[in-house]
Structures are given as C-alpha cells and as structure tokens.
C-alpha cells in the first residue's frame, strides 16, 4: 500500500527531545516500512526516517518561531496538506494518515484518497462546531476514554500509543520516586501531580520543557529540589 504520513511541523520526526506526536508518527512510519508498505513522510527538515521524506520546511517551526505559536503555523500546515493532496491526485498514495490535528481532519471529505486522522491530544473547547461538519470523516482514537469527548465522530478503531521496548527497559520492581514526564503547562496537570506526591509523601521528579512560563511561575514555589524536583527537558536516553 502507498501511504502518506502527515506529521506536525513543530519538531523533527522523531523528535530530539519533546514531541509526543512526532515520536508516535515516527514509530508508526518505521513499522509500516518494515511491513513492506511504500510510505512517504511529510515533515520538517532534519527528520530521520527509512520512508521517503518530503521536507515541507527546512527546519522545525518551533525553532523558527521560538516556541509554539499556533496562528503562525497555519499557512505551513495547509501547504503540507496541499503537497500531499497534489501527490495523491497524481496517484502516489492509496491513503493519507493525518497526525497534524483536528483542523486538518475537517479536510478529509475533500481528500483525493481516503484519509484517516489520529487525534493525539485533548479536544479544544471550540472543536465541536468544526468537528460536527466533518463527523463522517475517519478517525482513530488513542483510547476508548478519548471517544467520550466527541462520541459523534466516525471512529474506525482505537489504537493505543506504542513504545520501542528496546529503548525503554521494563523493570518489575518499582523505584522510590514518582516521575512526571510532560510539558510544564496547565493542561498537563502538573499541579495535580505535585498534590499527589505531597499527599503520598513520595518524592517526584518532573521532566519536560516549559511551554507556559506564566503557569510555571505559579507552581515554582512548590518545587523544593528535595521532595519535588524539576530536571528540565529530557530525551529517550
């Protein structure tokens, strides 16, 4: 099968450090190639893949903009979709797998070939009006619980995020501390994780880049460097 993978342009695929969606898109792409499919990955420059790589821009948008600025990336998102749709019209693809988010999902009905969208994030408050217009497009949920946020969408399957077991070693015995691995932002629930650590009396290490400086300042007094410590952004190693 000839498959187009549409990855976000924020980070390289796979990411050097933070980039959950980019990591999952990379894992799926590499496994599809191993299965013998003809895969084309649309992503930013600097990405590394065994599939055919189409560089939509020469470097990550996060580096170009100096952070996440969603209004500024919309033009490049639609440029990526246009490139994929044009290639699909030329017969290059049998299917398109969208990892770019919910706005792109709404274009599913005008795609030259079948398109499926995996939603890797929570649903924004203003998603419902748009999504109802595209409720008959094809979606993959990352958990059955996620479906409850928009039960009216046309879900094809639930596919949980996977990991490379050769990179993340399983240990039967638990450690002596909690680990919080996510961006330092309100939507990730950092404050709730700290509350759990405080209530259980366990130490907690927090790792991830700070995407909301204002919010981070509100939790900073709770980080004492002993029970609660912040170690910054980390990679898979």
Report each predicted region and the residues it spans.
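Catalytic cores of nucleotide-sugar-dependent glycosyltransferases that transfer UDP/GDP/TDP-activated
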Residues: 1-237
């Amino acid at each position: 099968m000839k498959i187009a993978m549409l990855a976000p342009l924020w980070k390289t695929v796979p990411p050097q450090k933070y980039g959950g969606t980019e990591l999952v898109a990379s894992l799926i792409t590499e496994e599809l190639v191993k299965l013998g499919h003809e895969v084309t990955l649309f992503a930013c420059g600097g990405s590394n893949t065994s599939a055919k790589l189409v560089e939509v821009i020469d470097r990550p948008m996060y580096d170009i903009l100096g952070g996440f600025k969603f209004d500024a990336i919309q033009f490049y998102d639609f440029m990526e979709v246009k490139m994929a749709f044009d290639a699909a019209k030329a017969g290059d693809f049998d299917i398109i797998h969208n990892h770019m988010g919910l706005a792109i999902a709404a274009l599913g009905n005008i795609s030259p070939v079948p398109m499926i969208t995996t939603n890797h994030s929570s649903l924004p408050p203003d998603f419902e009006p748009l999504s109802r217009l595209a409720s008959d497009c094809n979606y993959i949920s990352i958990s059955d619980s996620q479906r409850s946020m928009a039960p009216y969408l046309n879900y094809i399957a639930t596919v949980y995020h996977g990991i490379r077991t050769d990179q993340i070693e399983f240990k039967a015995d638990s450690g002596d501390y909690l680990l919080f691995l996510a961006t330092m932002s309100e939507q990730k629930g950092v404050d709730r994780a700290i509350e759990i650590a405080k209530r259980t009396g366990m130490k907690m290490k927090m790792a991830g880049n700070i995407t909301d400086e204002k919010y981070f300042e509100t939790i900073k007094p709770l980080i004492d460097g002993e029970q609660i410590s912040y170690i910054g952004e980390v990679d898979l190693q």
